Structures are given as C-alpha cells and as structure tokens.
C-alpha cells in the first residue's frame, strides 16, 4: 500500500500573535488582556511574558525564510487586534496594518499561503475594562460590518 499526500495538501505551521510577535509596546500597539495578565505578579511562572517572545515582529522575514527552507507551504497566524486598532474600536494604526501587509507579502513571495485568524484570545485591555465579551456591545462591535468598528 502506497501512502501519498495529495499535491495540494497544506504543510504548514501556526502561531498566535501574542505568543510570537513580541514588540508589545512598539509602533502604536496597545495592551491586550494577555499583557495585563502576564504582568500581574504570581500569574505566570517566572513572571514570563510576551514582551519579546521570539520577536517575530522584527524577525518575520527570517522566520518566513526558515519556513520556506523546510518546504512549508502554509502559515496560519493571528492578527493582534491591539496592533491594528489599538483602542479596540475607532482609529486604525497604519503601522500595524503595514506590518501584517509586509508579513503577507513575504509569505506570498516564498509561495507560502497565509491563513489568518482574526481573533486568538487577545482582547484589547480597553475593551476588557468595559466588560469584555460579557458586554453585548463589544460582541456587536466584533461582528460590525464597518472596518473601523471591528478587528
């Protein structure tokens, strides 16, 4: 019996923005609930946090090269809501949009199909302060058809 994956099979990797990007206070990014949680004494072993993580924000080109070198053809990553819309709603941060645009372009340049997760448990702290997901208005913001009102 011969086992073979189809030619269009996606071999890839997956990450989450808080767990990989670092640069939690760079280029207009605001705090997420994970920033607050990991900076609360006693919540995380050794007081570790994602402030630097593996610094994907600054090293994404090298990371994508490594993916290409091992013949991955897909990359699932999440967008940090706090990097794109720092206050959770309203003004869009051009530097955040630019980062993800460059990341996607690099993936495509290396024939790596980007798969995007819009939310990976990193609610902006400003929205958590208003009740988080228990606040119906925040749930409605997330599903809003207006790009300025959603992540």
For the regions a protein language model found, what residue spans apply to each?
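N-terminal carbohydrate-binding accessory modules
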Residues: 1-59, 63-69
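Active-site groove signature of glycoside hydrolases
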Residues: 119-128, 144
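Aromatic-lined substrate-binding rim segments of carbohydrate-active enzymes
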Residues: 64-70, 75-119
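The substrate-binding groove and active-site-proximal loops of carbohydrate-active enzymes
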Residues: 45-55, 82-97, 127-140
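Single conserved hydrophobic/aromatic residue that forms the stacking wall/gate
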Residues: 142-151
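Flexible loop/turn segments at secondary-structure boundaries
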Residues: 19-21, 84-86, 123
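Glycine-rich, aromatic-flanked loop segments that form ligand/cofactor-binding clefts
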Residues: 9-20, 108-121
């Amino acid at each position: 019996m011969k086992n073979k994956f189809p030619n269009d099979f996606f071999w890839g990797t997956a990450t989450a923005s808080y767990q990989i990007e670092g640069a939690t206070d760079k280029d207009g990014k605001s705090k997420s609930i994970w920033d607050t949680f990991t900076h609360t004494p006693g919540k995380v072993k050794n007081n570790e946090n994602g402030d630097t993580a593996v610094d994907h924000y600054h090293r994404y080109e090298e990371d994508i090269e490594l993916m290409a070198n091992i013949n991955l053809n897909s990359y699932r990553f999440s967008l940090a809501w706090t990097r794109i819309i720092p206050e959770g709603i309203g003004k869009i941060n051009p530097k955040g949009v630019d980062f993800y645009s460059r990341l996607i372009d690099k993936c495509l340049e290396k024939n790596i199909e980007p798969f995007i997760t819009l939310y990976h448990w990193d609610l902006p702290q400003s929205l958590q302060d208003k009740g988080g997901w228990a606040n119906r208005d925040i749930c409605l913001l997330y599903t809003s058809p207006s790009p300025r009102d959603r992540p």
